Regions:
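N-terminal beta1-alpha1 cap of cysteine-dependent amidohydrolase-like domains
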Residues: 1-30, 34, 168-170
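General beta-strand structural signal in soluble alpha/beta enzymes
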Residues: 6-9, 32-33, 64-67, 122-125
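Residue-level detector of flexible, active-site-proximal loop/helix-junction positions
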Residues: 12-14, 71, 129
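Structural motif
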Residues: 20-23, 56, 88, 115
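Residue-level preference for short coil/turn positions at secondary-structure junctions
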Residues: 26-27, 60, 118
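Class I SAM-dependent methyltransferase SAM-binding "motif I" and its flanking Rossmann-like core
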Residues: 34-108
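C-terminal and late-domain segments of enzyme folds
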Residues: 79-80, 84-170
Length: 170
């Protein structure tokens, strides 16, 4: 594609405060956040200049792609791997909670996550689906992603379509 790829080593909070890393986030065309443990990513990025740079990138029309635990961390709250309690997410999807490796036939975890959080809707992302985050809470489903507008609502499939960070009407 004629693009240079660069790895930014943001593993700890001090990495997220490093000016050079924040400049690189601001200057690149797109950012990819890999999997891992959501708690660790949140711990490294919460309240940091790097998180501000990611949010600014989205607001300016840049692209942020997150998979697995990184996608979960983008929501308003996350289920911690340490005891299952709810912890604040990064808020890049400020009205949503995200469940990855989602199976619509087994949606109990997403419903419980949404019920216990300030999120207005839930997004279930199967292994073959993805979300591309955009400005002002917009996102685009790649493959099939599922939206749950409330803990008791029906699951709505979003298939390769743009959407907004608002619950479905109804």
């Amino acid at each position: 594609f004629g693009r240079e790829v660069e790895i930014l080593p943001v593993y700890r909070d001090r990495d997220a405060r490093r000016g050079k890393n924040c400049e690189r986030i601001r200057d690149c065309a797109a950012v990819y956040l890999g999997g891992g443990v959501a708690d660790h990513l949140i711990e490294a990025l919460a309240g940091s200049p790097a998180l501000e740079a990611l949010a600014a990138k989205l607001e300016a029309g840049g692209v942020v792609v997150a998979i697995a635990a990184a996608a979960q961390a983008c929501g308003v709250e996350v289920r911690s791997v340490f005891g299952g309690r709810l912890i604040p997410g990064l808020g890049l999807l400020p009205r949503a909670v995200v469940e990855t490796n989602f199976d619509p036939g087994h949606d109990r975890r997403l419903r419980q996550l949404l019920e216990g959080s300030p999120g207005k809707f839930g997004l279930g992302i199967p292994a073959e689906g993805a979300l591309l985050l955009g400005p002002e809470g917009t996102f685009e489903a790649v493959g099939t992603v599922f939206r749950l507008s409330g803990p008791e609502a029906d699951i709505e499939p979003l298939v390769d379509e743009p959407a907004a960070d608002t619950p479905a009407p109804g």
